[in-house]
């Protein structure tokens, strides 16, 4: 084992997650933590890991950006023909992880993923910068390309043909993960970390403390 890696260690203990600090609604608890991360101007505070599973039970994970959340779910946008899109098409269950090391906090969220309505995808698509819209329209995400130059050429050709006025491609849009489980993790001294798990039972949220 690499001894240098074994020496990498950070002691936690800046904050706590006690019974009095826990909100009974996990969406409210998420909002409190998320807004604190944003207020501290943490880089990419809305970055999250999305884990999906393929039809042959191979998991994969990648970093995405959260674009909206409410009690209906957590929203992100991508190419429907990407690996994650194909995974979701066959297995609608996934997991999200938010990690804010500066706050010594992590949130895990599990649930079912569904596509957003076309009008919601359209609204966000046209809010994006023109370059991002073009990239979403031309990139054959998760497929092999010859080189980067070929991708730039596709982008230039698309711009020459369509200019700045074009519709959202049918293969690109939004998803929403509707949670049935949350886990809030707060780093504590001596690795006796706080873990609070929320589960949805009979349409009501219940929470319990887990051992670290």
What are these regions (language model features)?
Residues 1-212:
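Binding-site signature for planar aromatic cofactors or substrates
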